[in-house]
């Protein structure tokens, strides 16, 4: 490995020796139950507390690994390092009561009143932080130090990244945090299962928060799925991260059952819109391109979900007039669905996708009308009816072309459901409790939980067998968070071993001339994630766990030196133009095995059968009997390929 590793390893052992007296347990004062920390929780707590100059740490842990409890343990024992601390916790507002306040009151009630909470998704809370910032800064002296904890740090970082080269409103707060975190003796602990959310720029801002002024990370450093200056970057960031991910695969990769995590199967449903929905999609496409919504694909996304007679364009309507129009349309659709009551015979045939014979005329007519408006909702109902257990359905749209209309489809097919969204604030916690109840593990009482972005982070679902992604988010991190609501440590322990699985269903809708906004967004997500995965591999390599695994038996240092040096040493900039990587690539045409209708162009490396789009590896040839598989389309040779992730 590298020389610096052994020095950092010796410092880790110094911290472990220094904190050997800390208890492995923490007591729940509400239930009077003593909980033993997991080895990784105890390890990172001791290293973070034991090293004065290791002032920053990222907990890059899977969802459900106990980040909140670990943070509370650190808060409880940080006085081992210094007697007086101000605790400043940045969180999403929805996470204040559960898990944060409940966990603190249970395990550290004596300090619960001495913690300052700031909600980074609340303008009034941020204003409050600005007002108290000066008093916090003035109180930092020889008698007081500051511990900053940031939960779901990717959410905070994404608010600080420049948009269209313009400074975001959150940037001044971000700069204040950097100043506070790097005041002599202070510490900052950041937590996330997905520390990079949208793009590489966020990694720069994350480093700027944790270890400012040491480097500027450039996307150009990633060539052919590798970091060209890996050693320099690694040395600069060594020991910055704690890494605990039992499932390293991204959202699109299937995984087996492992260490309490359910098996994950990934299923793509490629479905065709009705002629009516296809026509409205084409109109929506023209509208998007004529307006500023083209890049966001807004109208096309709405129509891909639900297309009821016409486009719902606001135009010159004010908010009240527009909302009234939507209410009238929804009431009209609601009135129509009240007359639909599918027979049991039809539902059984619908589940098997066998609607050719022996069907009541009324059933088939009603089905055709519902399909005309939304092929996605129809497919979602089929998946739900075929599920052996409970189902989670992610739909970010809450109003007309979203949850509001989807629920009427569920009523038509006699599907029971609860809703967790911004519209159900008063009832959602009680309903989720009923959904998670042990007696509902098979979904017989409540089959589906529909949830929007309001439920994509911070809450847990138990014993779920199917997740349906009805509308794509913009990045893989959001997908990971969505799946993390139900694929969590021990989330399926109450089910028999053979039922500890989760099927993840992606519903991809196409017009009758093969246009698809879902496929466009899916490709964008995969392209961005290929670069983010390179950074995740880097974070694993710099983690205190990776270093300690190699140097756990090295002699501890006698006193701290290295982290103060690392924090103040800037990485040497690399001249990208001096780096030459020679790979011979051949232009080809190919298609994905699951979507042979979409013909793509790429560059093939014949040595490893990997296909590139510019500098990014995007696919790999399908090989059978040592030969690539191909088809002939319009006299063109089209290779068959699968998605590829390095």
Swiss-Prot record:
GO terms for cellular component: virion component. One of its GO terms (molecular function) is ribonucleoside triphosphate phosphatase activity. GO terms for biological process: DNA-templated transcription. Residues 466-532 are annotated as: Binding to the cap-specific mRNA (nucleoside-2'-O-)-methyltransferase. SUPFAM superfamilies: P-loop containing nucleoside triphosphate hydrolases. The keyword Ribonucleoprotein does not apply. It is found in: Virion. InterPro entries: Helicase_ATP-bd, Helicase_C-like, NPHI_C, P-loop_NTPase, SNF2_N. Its EC number is 3.6.1.15. Its main location: virion. ATP binds at residues 61-68. Residues 48-213 form the Helicase ATP-binding domain. Keywords: ATP-binding, DNA-binding, Hydrolase, Nucleotide-binding, Transcription, Virion. A motif (DEXH box) lies at residues 151-154. Pfam families: Helicase_C, NPHI_C, SNF2-rel_dom. Residues 377-540 form the Helicase C-terminal domain. It catalyses: a ribonucleoside 5'-triphosphate + H2O = a ribonucleoside 5'-diphosphate + phosphate + H(+). It comes from the Viruses. DNA-dependent ATPase required for providing the needed energy to achieve the termination of early transcripts. Acts in concert with the RAP94 subunit of the virion RNA polymerase and the capping enzyme/VTF to catalyze release of UUUUUNU-containing nascent RNA from the elongation complex. NPH-I must bind ssDNA in order to exhibit ATPase activity. Belongs to the helicase family. NPH I subfamily. Monomer. Interacts (via C-terminus) with RAP94 (via N-terminus). Interacts with the cap-specific mRNA (nucleoside-2'-O-)-methyltransferase. This is Nucleoside triphosphatase I.
């Amino acid at each position: 490995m590298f020389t610096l590793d052994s020095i950092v390893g010796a410092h880790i052992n110094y911290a472990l020796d220094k904190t050997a007296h800390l208890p492995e347990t923490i007591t729940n004062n509400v239930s009077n139950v003593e909980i033993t920390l997991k080895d990784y929780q105890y390890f990172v707590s001791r290293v973070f507390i034991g090293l004065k100059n290791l002032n920053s740490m990222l907990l890059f842990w899977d969802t459900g690994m106990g980040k909140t409890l670990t943070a509370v343990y650190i808060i409880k024992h940080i006085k081992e390092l210094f007697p007086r601390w101000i605790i400043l916790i940045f969180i999403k507002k929805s996470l204040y009561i559960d898990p944060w306040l409940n966990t603190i009151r249970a395990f550290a009630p004596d300090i619960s009143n001495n913690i300052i909470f700031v909600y980074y998704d609340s303008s009034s809370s941020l204003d409050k932080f600005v007002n108290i910032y000066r008093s916090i800064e003035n109180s930092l002296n020889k008698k007081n130090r500051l511990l900053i904890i940031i939960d779901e740090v990717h959410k905070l970082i994404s608010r600080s990244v420049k948009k269209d080269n313009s400074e975001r409103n959150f940037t001044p707060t971000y700069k204040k945090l950097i100043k506070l975190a790097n005041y002599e003796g202070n510490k900052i602990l950041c937590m996330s299962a997905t520390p990079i959310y949208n793009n590489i720029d966020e990694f720069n801002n994350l480093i700027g928060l944790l270890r400012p002024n040491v480097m500027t990370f450039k996307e150009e450093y990633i060539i052919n799925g590798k970091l060209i200056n890996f050693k320099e970057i690694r040395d600069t960031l060594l020991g910055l991260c704690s890494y605990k991910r039992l499932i390293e695969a991204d959202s699109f990769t299937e995984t087996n059952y492992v260490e309490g995590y359910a098996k994950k199967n990934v299923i793509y449903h490629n479905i065709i819109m009705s002629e009516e929905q296809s026509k409205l999609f084409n109109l929506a496409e023209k509208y998007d391109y004529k307006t500023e919504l083209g890049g966001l694909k807004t109208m096309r996304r709405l129509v891909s979900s639900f297309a009821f007679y016409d486009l719902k364009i606001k135009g010159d309507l004010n908010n009240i007039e527009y909302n009234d129009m939507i209410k009238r349309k929804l009431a009209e659709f609601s009135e129509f669905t009240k007359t639909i009551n599918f027979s049991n015979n039809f539902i059984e045939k619908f589940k098997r996708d066998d609607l050719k014979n022996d069907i009541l005329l009324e059933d088939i007519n009603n089905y055709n009308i519902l399909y005309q408006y939304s092929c996605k909702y129809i497919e979602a109902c089929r998946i739900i009816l075929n599920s052996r257990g409970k189902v989670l359905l992610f739909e970010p749209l809450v109003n007309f072309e979203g949850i509001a209309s989807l629920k009427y489809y569920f009523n038509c097919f006699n599907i029971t459901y609860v809703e967790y969204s911004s519209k159900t604030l008063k009832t959602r916690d009680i309903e989720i409790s009923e959904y998670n109840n042990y007696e509902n593990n098979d979904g017989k009482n409540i089959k589906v939980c529909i949830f929007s972005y309001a439920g994509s982070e911070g809450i847990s679902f138990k014993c779920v067998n199917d997740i349906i992604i009805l509308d794509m988010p913009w990045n893989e991190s959001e997908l990971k968070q969505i799946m993390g609501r139900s694929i969590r440590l021990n989330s399926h322990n109450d089910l028999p071993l053979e039922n500890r699985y989760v099927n993840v269903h992606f519903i991809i809708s196409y017009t009758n001339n093969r246009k698809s906004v879902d496929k466009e967004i899916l490709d964008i997500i995969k392209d961005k994630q290929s670069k983010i995965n390179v950074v995740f591999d880097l974070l694993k390599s710099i983690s205190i766990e990776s270093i300690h695994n190699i140097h756990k038996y090295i002699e501890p240092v006698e006193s701290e030196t290295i982290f103060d040096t690392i924090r103040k040493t800037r990485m040497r900039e690399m001249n990208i133009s001096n780096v030459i990587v020679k790979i011979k690539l051949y232009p080809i045409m190919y298609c994905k095995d699951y979507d042979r209708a979409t013909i793509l162009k790429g560059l093939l490396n014949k040595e490893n059968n990997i296909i590139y789009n510019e500098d990014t590896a995007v696919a790999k040839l399908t090989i059978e009997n040592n030969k690539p598989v191909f088809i002939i389309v319009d006299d063109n040779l089209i290779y068959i390929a699968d998605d590829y992730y390095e």
